[in-house]
């Protein structure tokens, strides 16, 4: 039986207390470290243990990359049942620190009634008061300290999750790595803050890089950070940044990769796998704001993107127009519906890129993709387990796994991305005369599909 023990490293000799036993594995707690592993290093963060963000700050980066590579391999072997996996070396990050361009800090009351702001402890909503985070740029630290000072002077109330009272809920910040622009967003349980002019003054003095200060109004009893309504206190409610030579406008609500440098590495690998020559139709399913597809649009004859969130589709359309991309269209709808509608209207994309959420693809999506018979499918995954499950169906639908590359988008954390190249076993022909299993697609609703 495997025993998972947080805070340990491969090669440690230690005393462990088993605290929870399940059917196939157990959880333990480190009681005493007898002999440290050669992979161990001194954590560079004072709250590395209790904070729920990083889990690998106590080991070397080389060891972290080995763990993440093995995690992908284990999932493909154990869940997918694959052997002789064509794994390529993991794409490690050039830096383990200061790589995040977004930060959201929950706000609460300490036992002595003062504001605390930071990150949630492991598996809880208990806030660990934090004045710096090594994953985020130093400019966020300065903005957070100015915000703390303003709260003390203004006396603005702190949100109480249990009572659903008080005003200040989160401090949410974004920055453009290339543009240098900074957006500060105060998430509030109400439309008005005490001392708004003072807040603007203190933030601008502490952080000259700030280009916008907004209030996000969230009056709901919810764990969702942002509400729908924004009010601008100063400047503009968006920032700009450049990714793969394209410029994107980013609002508090917009999806944008939090590690721009590694996002470019991932997109470049996806483009390499796509193998575009300029003659192909490219379908980008789960396209979000269009970043992956738009980064490849200049190498394709035609780009079609599909996304379920209307605001994201609108952002994708704006991003295409802003970057003078004229060979793209975007559909708003569920991936299953979008794939089926595109199939029925006769679209037979040569290359399909899919970047689904953590839950992976609906089985009907994979069935329709297989019916379209693209020569290549590029699968970008944020969860090795659902990736393995979906690849199992793809191989059953006449696709081969040609290459697998893990990508470390979030150094220090447990997360790992993966890019997979799938090729059709018989690339000639484009699905004419194929019959799709209607039982897998019976829920398709054309009325929910629309062009953006």
PLM regions with names:
Residues 1-43, 47, 329, 336-337, ...:
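Terminal RNA-binding accessory module
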Residues 11, 136, 259:
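Short, conserved phosphate/pyrophosphate- and ester-handling motifs at nucleotide-, phospho-/glycolipid
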Residues 31-43, 49-158, 178, 193:
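Extended interfacial segments that mediate partner engagement and assembly in macromolecular machines
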Residues 171:
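Flexible loop/N-cap segments at domain edges
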Residues 174-176:
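Structural signature of eukaryotic scaffold interfaces centered on beta-propeller domains
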Residues 181-190:
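C-terminal lobe
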Residues 191-452:
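Rossmann-like S-adenosyl-L-methionine
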